[in-house]
Regions:
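Ligand-binding pockets and gating/stacking loops
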Residues: 2-373
Length: 373
């Protein structure tokens, strides 16, 4: 007599293919595998999930395996820079310069503009003890090359900006998953109560593809979403109260508000969005003095400003953001991500002028940040 819960895996030459056999065998092992994973007999009652309220917070947590790093700064420069002109030299391209490509080209979403080979017009040189080849377009990077890992084998199964960016930031091409910064703050918490645990620093010329999804908490509680620091002053809006509400007046108001919010949350302790808003409001209060101090780069030395390129109009904006990123992690912020504008490296033409311009803006400040850390 056959069991109704386990599929029939009887095989005959007339009715079973290899695919059917493997499918039936795999299905029949599911109850056994689940029982083994849960360390319980097949006859045991199902384990009830814990549906009680969970406590999510930003308290600092110890990782399963200790490491030397306590924070991360990500310089996310969206687009596809010409690797053969920057960090992946191809001498054969120069030998075949302006020749017609001898093989067939499979075009996708790019126009069939040309089938001629174009060698790089820029010189490469090996730098550091590693001997890594770097283009003359990146003099700052060449000075810190031994502190940099160059990966030349990365690829993705999609060629659209949106999916690729989401894969880089969240690990999957599908939207809706938490960004890397959200996972880090969820797993490790924060080492400061005066500043956000996760900061996104945007570009004055606009957001990258997918916009705010780049620092989204996905299905994690809103507590782990990135906090935006603007590229222009005031970098954080509405941080300081009106003059009439400052001092004791504000303290009394916030004290009463905290009490009312606490009572409201006790009656709705499963509402994670409510808990996140309450936590963020209390954080905003503490940030009034701490954020102003962290964002004030005037306290840095003249030499530091010069190192980050802040005295140069071309590198000033990105240099300021790099310096602020360093000041944030020094004060306990767990994850800081700097974004460039939409399609920053997406050069579909005029490469000989547009690629150097993109390099000039970010090369010196980015190298200074790595060197300064």
């Amino acid at each position: 007599m056959q069991s109704k819960s386990i599929p029939d895996i009887t095989c005959t030459e007339s009715n079973t293919t290899r695919r059917k056999f493997l499918s039936r065998v795999s299905l029949s092992t599911i109850p056994l595998a689940l029982a083994f994973a849960n360390e319980q007999p097949l006859s045991a009652k199902p384990v009830k999930p814990d549906l009680g309220p969970r406590n999510f917070d930003l308290a600092a947590k110890n990782p399963h395996q200790s490491g030397t790093a306590t924070a991360m700064i990500s310089m996310f420069m969206q687009g596809g820079p010409s690797q053969v002109d920057l960090m992946d030299p191809k001498p054969l391209l120069n030998k075949m310069h302006l020749q017609k490509f001898p093989e067939k080209i499979k075009y996708d979403n790019a126009a069939e503009a040309s089938s001629r080979i174009f060698g790089t017009p820029w010189k490469f040189k090996q730098y550091g003890q590693s001997g890594t080849a770097i283009s003359e377009l990146l003099p700052g990077l060449s000075e810190i090359v031994d502190d940099v890992l160059v990966i030349r084998s990365m690829h993705t199964g999609v060629n659209n900006h949106g999916q690729s960016i989401h894969a880089m930031n969240s690990g999957r091409i599908q939207e809706g998953r938490p960004a890397l910064g959200s996972w880090m703050t969820y797993a490790l918490g924060s080492e400061t109560r005066q500043l956000p645990a996760y900061v996104a620093m945007t570009d004055p010329q606009g957001l990258p593809v997918l916009g705010v999804l780049n620092w989204s908490n996905g299905w994690l509680p809103s507590l782990y979403q990135g906090t935006v620091i603007r590229p222009v002053e005031p970098r954080i809006l509405n941080l300081n109260p009106p003059t009439a509400l400052r001092g004791k007046t504000q303290e009394n108001f916030l004290s009463l508000l905290k009490q009312l919010n606490g009572q409201h949350h006790q009656r709705r302790n499963r509402e994670l969005e409510l808990a996140a808003r309450r936590t963020n409001l209390e954080l905003a209060t503490r940030m009034q003095s701490a954020a102003a101090n962290a964002l004030d780069i005037s306290k840095e030395t003249k030499a530091t400003h010069e190192m980050y390129g802040i005295n140069n109009p071309v590198t000033e904006e990105f240099g300021k953001r790099c310096l602020i990123a360093r000041r944030l992690v020094e004060r306990g912020v767990r994850f800081v991500q700097l974004f460039t504008k939409n399609q920053y490296w997406d050069h579909h033409g005029s490469l000989q002028t547009r690629l150097p311009a993109s390099c000039q803006k970010i090369d010196i400040p980015a190298a200074a940040l790595v060197n300064d850390l």
